[in-house]
Amino acid sequence: RLEKAKMAISRMVEKLSNDKIGLIVFAGDAYVQLPITTDYSSAKLFLSNISTDIVPVQGTAIGSAIDLAARSFTPETETSKAIIVITDGENHQDDAVAAAKQAHEKGIVIHTIGMGLEQGAPIPEKGKPGQFMQDGQGNVVISKLDEQTLQDIAKAGEGLYIRASNTEVGLNRLLDEVNRMEKSLLEERGYSDYAEKYQYF
């Protein structure tokens, strides 16, 4: 699923022009993989280097990732800002809906894409082929797609929730929405500017 998301983001980057993009990766914690930039070649390079090994803490801290993404924007810019959350798991670490509300108060729209399975799937152990994470009681940990939370996050951020299919991740639809949002903003202001878009895992 990670490779599928990376390919979709790479294709989206190819369609950008005069837009800023950044990358944040998250599991049990969130890290800036690529600061906001218009250097699309660097974006694709940093994207290609993303793997499950670069985040040491397991989990799904969506709220931390949203907070970090929101802080990464240039504060005083008048351009439209969007965060796209792509995840395949449940959120256990923090209050992601509250984080989305706080980000939206700063003028940031939050979109979410769910890539997991509602019935869930075991989480592979790093460096241990064929073995899966276990909880304190020795039970295999099952990571399930929590669509309700992702819908709530998108609602709090006045964005869209998209369930990824086997053939389409949903980034094209979100890119159209972000471009529409920017066009509406430009019509209101009557001058041209560029959008600050933020992409992260």
Where do the protein language model's features map onto the residues?
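Membrane-embedded segments
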Residues: 1-81, 98
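Structural recognition of the beta-strand scaffold that forms the well-ordered cores
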Residues: 24, 85, 111-114, 162-163
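Solvent-exposed loop/turn segments at secondary-structure junctions
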Residues: 28-32, 89-92, 116-120, 166-170
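Helical mechanochemical/support elements of P-loop NTPase systems and associated helical scaffolds
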Residues: 39, 58-65, 146-149, 170, ...
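Short, hinge-like loop/turn segments at secondary-structure boundaries
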Residues: 39-42, 128-131, 179-182
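VWA/integrin I-like adhesion module and closely mimicked acidic/polar interface patches used
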Residues: 56-60, 82, 89-156
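Extended, hydrophilic extramembrane loops/domains of integral membrane proteins
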Residues: 150-183
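C-terminal signal-anchor/stop-transfer transmembrane helix together with its immediate cytosolic
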Residues: 180-201
